[in-house]
Amino acid sequence: MSTLDKIFEEINKAESIVILTHENPDGDAVGTSLALYNALKLYGKNNVDVIIPECPKTFNFLPGSSEIKKESNVENYDLAIAVDCASFDMLNGLSKKFEDATTTVVIDHHGTNNMFGDYNFVNPDAPACAEVMIVALSAFKLEINKEIGTCLLVGIITDTGGFKYQGVTAETFEFVAGLLRKGVNVSDTYRKVLQVKTKSAFELTRAANNRIEFFEDGKIAYTYVTLEDYEKFNAVAGDHEGIVDIGRDIEGVEVSIFIREIKGKGLKVSLRSNDKVNVDEIALLYGGGGHP
């Protein structure tokens, strides 16, 4: 029996299911979580929760987003599924929900994943967890309709930077073609996720732009935002999305570094690279992880 067969067996057995993802979730985390949530509900699993304590408002248009919970009083779920999460520690405040579940599953695409579930379906060659989820849902023979497809597309668009990051393959576009056939509006979704910004997000991005510094003969770009910036511009979770990519888009830059201050939690460092530097290995040295 394959790993996916075993996971689907656990899904069928479970009376209660919780879907979790990493803190400070991006579009791949939110989109893939909601795709699974919607697919399981459509399949007839009624007792399913998706918990995302701080979901960026950018993704409020996604089907099922109104059902996202900030917390849950359920102590012991039959099945916990961690999505787009490379390690147990990345679950942060939700780690106990995962740990206390009868059975745990991990669905992910990070090469640094430490296989922390009872069952792990991980493909480090996939540029987005949404691609891994498409494979899983197809293996489960669960329907991918327009609504679920929209959630999956958000995941792919986000983690590929609009199809411009390394790791994008012919299969990526084949997956997107399949979603198009389901009626998903690619141009509208792309615009909502990557092009439309709130005024607060625009101001936060402008502040970061004004602080960019270069090192190593212009090969490294660095910028940051502070708690004071968040307060000044009334910025919220998710408003920082895309800032780390600004430096990488500048000619000659190989590595972009973005640091943001998080209230009560210190500093969060994000790294992005072009082809020559594997930044996930650098992040791993400091307890982080991810992909180039």
Residue spans of the language-model regions?
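A generic local secondary-structure boundary/capping motif
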Residues: F8, K70-E71, G93-K96, N120-N123, ...
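Short glycine/serine/threonine-rich phosphate/pyrophosphate-binding segments
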Residues: G27-S33, F88-L91
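Hydrophobic helix-and-loop "lid/oligomerization" segment in the mid-to-C-terminal part
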Residues: S2-E23, G31-N60, K70-Y77, T158-P292
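Short alpha-helices
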Residues: I107-F175
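Short glycine-rich anion-binding loops that position phosphate/pyrophosphate groups of nucleotides
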Residues: N24-P25, C85-F88, H110-T112, L227-E228, ...
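Generic enzyme active-site microenvironment
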Residues: L20, N24, A82, V106-I107, ...
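Solvent-exposed alpha-helices and their adjacent loops that cap or buttress functional pockets
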Residues: S72-E75, K96-E99, N113-N114, I144-K146, ...
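Active-site cofactor/cluster-binding pocket
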Residues: P63-Y119
